[in-house]
Each structure stands twice: as C-alpha cells, then as structure tokens.
C-alpha cells in the first residue's frame, strides 16, 4: 500500500508468505512462538489454544500469580483491583457511559438478564470474568436490519474524578443482517475499570468498532472485547491505547459463518512507567474466512512496557482459511521494553494462507545520521521516522476524526521525546560534506 509518507520505517517489512518471526531487538524484546499455554489451573500447559478455559463463573478462574502463561507479562499486583482479588466485586460507580447516536441506531439500557448479553462469547480470564460478574446494567447499541448509519456512533466511557473504587462496564454493539455502521468508544478520565465489550455482526453486516484508551495517568483498565462474525460479515476492530498506568485489552474473535472477514488494527504509545498489553485470539472455526491483524507501537521512557500476544487458531474444519498477523515495536529510548509473541496453530493443511511476523527495534541511528547529513535537523528527522512508522496503519482506521486525533497525539508524544533527549543526549555531529 502506498501511503504518501516518507520511507522511514526502521524495521524491515516481513514477507507475508514466509510466516517467519523476525526479532530485530537487542535486550528490549522477545519474539517467540509458544507451543503451550496455561489457563491458570495450577499452571498446567495446554496442548492447544482451543483448550483454554472460558466460563461465565468467576470461581473457575483463580487469582493469577503472574506465573501463568496468560499473565506472565502482566503486573498482576497493580491489576489486583480489577481482578477482584478481594472477592468483593467491582461494585464502584466510578464511570459514566454516554452515547450519541444517529437516527438509524437504537440505544437501550438493559439489565444483566437480557438474553442478548453473553452471545458474543464467554470470559477467557480472571479479569474478564470479574467484569462480567460485576456489571448491573448494559448499554446496548443496535444497528437494525439493512440500516446504514448516517454518521458514527459515539460512546464515551468517562471516569469520575475522586471515585477510585473499581467498577464494571458492559457494552453490546449489535449489527443486524446487512447493516453498516461505525462505532467509536472513547475512554477518558481517571478510572479503575473492568470492562466487557461484545460485538455481534450478523450475516452480511459491515461494522467498524474503534476503542480509544486515552485515560488519565494512574488509570487501571482491563477490557475483554468479544467479537462474533456471521456469514459474509466484515468487522474492522481498531484499538488505540495511549493513556493509563496499566491497560490490558484482550480481543477474542470467533467466526461462525463462512465468508466472513476480520481486520484487527492496533496502535499504542507507551511512556515511562506505563504497561500497555494487547492479547488477541482469532478463532477460525468455520471454512473460508479471512483475518488480518496488524499492531504497531512505540515506547519511550524508563519502565515503559508494551506487550502484544497474537494467537490464531485454524481448526480442522476451517478449510480455505486465509490469515496473517503482524506486530512491530519501535523503541525510542533506553529503559523501555517490548514483548511480542505471535502464535499460529493450524489443524488442517487445506488453507489459502497463514503467517505471522514480529519485529522490535531501537531507533535507527544510522538512518537518523543519513537524514541529518542531507540537511534535515535532528528533531525533524526523528519526527519523520516515527510518522512513517505509524502512517500506514493510521490510514487503515477509516474514521477521519480518529485519524486526525491520533496524529495529534503522536505529535504530543514526540514533543516529550524531544524534550527528554535534549536534556540527556548531546546533538550528534554531522559531516560538513557527504559524497553523492
């Protein structure tokens, strides 16, 4: 894809047909394919991702210790409030949910006994089960059969200042047959939140769901996104994570009808002390479906930590599957770390294609030297590299207002980078002449 951005991505583009995992980092990243997983019951490894425990019952999930596969990168002590480690439930009232919807879309507030809730799948870990067990009411957004939303649906999940008790929020986005809509979910303010977002796309529906995590510093957020696609449905699922102290997003995607397509797009920027974690599971459970997942992140500052885990399962029945997942991380300063783990499990040889790639690299000093040698100031050169790194994915979001906001947020992050470098790093020397 041609984006018009400068060719300044410091990481080599992996070849999709190889499915190899590339690690370009030194001590800041680990990229590996794991053949076993742990669902928390005594740390017993599973032979298949399909064997992972999924249950609506919180008692089925012990409080994690950090030794479990599912939690090995997470700061479980800091996440304790949203894991309901005390067994008291996430009963606070620290968040408000507001919705602005076009006339083609209906919004309801329903009790937890509504039959539509839980249809997108079951919780897959302790945080998801705690959020499910604790919510009292759900906000249900429905796009009617064959309806086309005239403008994006805006959902705002806002933390209430001064209310630090852990709370739970439940949202359901339901796209009926042959409908089309864009839904933007914005998370802002202070919060200690366990969240469930269910996305149901019925046959032939086309749905874009954008979840933006732009919390205040100190926020704790664990969110389970459960996505179910019917026959010929298309879902573009976008995750943008910028704010919060600890944010952990776990999208689970299930295909239930042939011909469906899922696009997963993720962008994140971790600053000093932040832990931003994204764990995906794409379950190809029926034939002839397609999935594409691409996440990119940048990190800067001491203690900045980004985690990406992408699990793809192609079941024996899912012949004709076409899947590919990619994760890239750009480490801008010392003291930051990115962990990237792509996993691909294939139970049938009759597929269209399957592959994954992971790359993590430091800021390329040679490339910076090259740009500066051609008269580009260091600050501008660094901006060009980072803008080029994110440009293609930003254009894939498909929501201009979100794209503009993200570009502005990246500029703010780059200002922080420049300020930090100005205080600790002397300017690099540039030769007076460079041979053509």
Residue ranges and their predicted role:
Residues 49, 60-62, 324, 365, ...:
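Generic hydrophobic-segment detector
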Residues 2-132, 137, 148, 295, ...:
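N-terminal amphipathic, basic helical "cap/leader" segment at the start of enzyme domains
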Residues 71, 384-385:
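Residue-level "edge-of-site" marker
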Residues 9, 24, 118-376, 386, ...:
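Conserved beta-strand/loop scaffold segments within soluble protein domains that form the structured core
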